[in-house]
Structure formats: structure tokens, C-alpha cells
Amino acid sequence: MILGFIGTGKISSSIIFGIFKSKLKIKRIYISSRNRNLAKKLSKSYGKIKILNNNQEIIDKSSVILLGVTPNVGNKILPKLRFSKNKKIISLISTINLNKLKKITKNNNIVRAIPLPPIEIKKGPIIVCPPE
């Protein structure tokens, strides 16, 4: 599995740390350079992480894309990006609903997830809202 994270804040980094503490089979993780210091820390910690400077490149190279940006940033950048229909999208964006995400991305293969920071230590719930 190849994951791509658009947005590299607390929740995205907690998910990444949790992934590497788990037994998930991850081939590669691409992350955005938006939070440069955190992105560098993640890439130095794990050899399977690569920082990319272009969000479209993250989408193109990943099989599963996680949207971990604020609602304001999401509304600004998502309409400029192209998502193919075969990509799986997991939105961590709190206030952009599924219908709007489907319209913006032209992709129906989207779920919303609300992980909490304890995911980093493989604890705590993840609320998932499926596409239907």
C-alpha cells in the first residue's frame, strides 16, 4: 500500500507514527512539505517516508490519499487538484462534508475519519463515516 498525506500536522503525524508502530504493510508514504520541520522529522524517523513539494504528485503516486489540512486550506487547494476515480480518499477535514468532497474531487471513493492523537500509540477510537 502506498499512502499520501496532504497536510503534515498533528493528526497526520500521529497516524503516521501509529502506522509504523503497527504491523501494517506499507510500501511507501508520501507527505507534503507544508510543515517543513515536522515533515523532516518524519522522513528522518522512517525510511519509507518521502517528502514531496507538490500535492498533485502526492495524489498521482499514492493509492490512498489522506487529506489532513484545515477546512480553509482544503477549500482553497482541493479544487485545483485532480483525483482519479480509482484513488481511495480519507478525509480528516472536520467541516467539509462528504457531498462537497465528492463534488470537489469528482471521486465517490471517499470516507471521513476523525482520529484522535492517541492513535500515535495505537490507542483511542477512530470515527469513520462511510460514503453512504
Feature locations, PLM:
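Rossmann-like NAD(P)(H) cofactor-binding subdomain of soluble oxidoreductases
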Residues: R36-L38, Y46-I49, N55-D60, V64-V128
